[in-house]
Design a protein with these regions (language model features):
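N-terminal post-signal-peptidase region of extra-cytosolic proteins
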Residues: 37-51, 57, 72-80, 93-108, ...
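Bacterial Sec signal peptide processing site at the extreme N-terminus
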Residues: 17-44
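Hydrophobic helical h-region of N-terminal Sec-dependent signal peptides
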Residues: 9-19
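Gly/Thr-rich phosphate-binding beta-strand-loop-beta motif of the actin/hexokinase/Hsp70
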Residues: 62
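Bacterial N-terminal signal peptides that target proteins for export
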Residues: 1-10
């Protein structure tokens, strides 16, 4: 790997008015409010078959790479200590743009832009992001991140989960901190309706953005 990596420059994030007045957007490296305000810049790969997804569990960062070049970087939420995201080199096993949780509790809850890895029970998908490990093992991504990662990958794309990556102290450190925990739960009727998938395709969810 080259010693000098091409760093992504994140544009300033525009302030987004959400349900709570405390949700604010600041410069990268600081608090950015909720994940619905985050839209990562992306570089198109020159060789899509060389794309890899790298996940840092300690930094809660996801990087889409091609060789030593970072094409996309984003904060994510990974598995908590009792249900960690499986470490190792995996591959995307399946992709489902519109998917719902099938097990209880939470059956019917949308898990949009689903990309399974390790096993059918683990995936990268849209979900509420918090600044600490909080999932049952999946990797939750901001909505706009999830769409871009979904479009950049294919079944068979490597997913490499490690405690840290070479980019955590550079690109990763410049990313904002995202926290969806202040947001209320959307109505159950909305989350289980077809409108949630129609909104997903427009890059929005309920009235969060």
């Amino acid at each position: 790997m080259k010693k000098t990596l091409r760093l992504l420059t994140l544009p300033a994030l525009a302030a987004t008015t959400l349900l709570l007045n405390s949700c604010q957007t600041t410069t990268s490296g600081g608090t950015s409010g909720t994940a619905f305000s985050f839209d990562p810049p992306v570089t198109k790969p020159s060789n899509p078959s060389a794309v890899k997804v790298r996940i840092s569990t300690s930094a809660q960062r996801l990087y889409v790479t091609e060789g030593d070049k970072v094409l996309l970087a984003s904060p994510v939420a990974v598995g908590k200590a009792s249900s960690p995201t499986p470490a190792g080199t995996h591959r995307i096993m399946s992709k489902t743009r519109h998917r719902r949780r099938v097990s209880s509790p939470g059956a019917g809850y949308p898990m949009t832009y689903w990309m399974s890895f390790y096993s059918a029970a683990y995936g990268m998908h849209w979900g509420f992001v918090k600044p600490y490990p909080c999932t049952a093992g999946c990797v939750r991504m901001p909505l706009k991140t999830a769409k871009k990662v979904f479009d950049m990958t294919r079944v068979g794309t490597p997913v490499i989960v490690t405690r840290s990556t070479p980019w955590d102290s550079s690109i990763g450190a410049r990313l904002p901190t995202l926290d969806d925990s202040p947001l209320p739960n959307p109505p159950d009727g909305y989350m289980k309706s077809s409108k949630v998938f129609a909104d997903q395709e427009q890059g929005k969810m309920w009235n969060f953005n």
